[in-house]
């Protein structure tokens, strides 16, 4: 697929989001924030608000990242292009589950997911400074029951550490998944259907 000529900025450090944008031929430049890990980003407060629904939470973070990216362009006098922001969050019985803070936390999260169905929500937002739009993908993922050894060995690979829910569907954790309903790319971290809708609404040809 020939890359589109217009560029965007991707306000994310995620290698999976970069891979998915390349998959559909989008030209982009990275626009990194300070910090970069959940809870450590000086530009984006990722603390859930009291009583905030998970759908609103994930949308708020994606919008905030895109809008913060536009401000960063102004501060740094960078060429003006639209900024794409995204956030992925898991929900299990009303509990928001983000990235693990350490190996013990990763193991605890995987024990929670074992043998159960959870939701994966990925919101994507696009902003050019004067207009901002967003879309959200919601999928369901069911894990088979996992034993302690499986969880310990998986955590030891290091794969869970930079991922919401402590697993990557495109990696070794694919062996844990009995069923998915929804968007595979949304579960990876960037729903391509919704992303294409946003790009086209801003006049980016695909």
From Swiss-Prot:
What's the EC number here?
Answer: 3.6.1.9
Gene Ontology terms, MF aspect:
dTTP diphosphatase activity; UTP diphosphatase activity
Its BP terms in the Gene Ontology are:
nucleotide metabolic process
Compartments (UniProt record)? Cytoplasm
Keywords per UniProt: Cytoplasm, Hydrolase, Nucleotide metabolism
Query: Lineage of the source organism?
Result: Bacteria, Pseudomonadati, Pseudomonadota, Betaproteobacteria, Rhodocyclales
Which Pfam families does this entry report, sorted A to Z?
Maf
Report the source organism.
Aromatoleum aromaticum (strain DSM 19018 / LMG 30748 / EbN1) (Azoarcus sp. (strain EbN1))
Q: What is the uppermost EC class here?
A: hydrolase
Q: Where is this site: Important for substrate specificity?
A: 16, 88, 170
Gene Ontology cellular-component annotations: cytoplasm
Q: Does the keyword Hydrolase apply?
A: yes
Q: Which cofactor does it need?
A: a divalent metal cation
Q: Where is the active site?
A: 87 (proton acceptor)
Listed name of the protein: dTTP/UTP pyrophosphatase
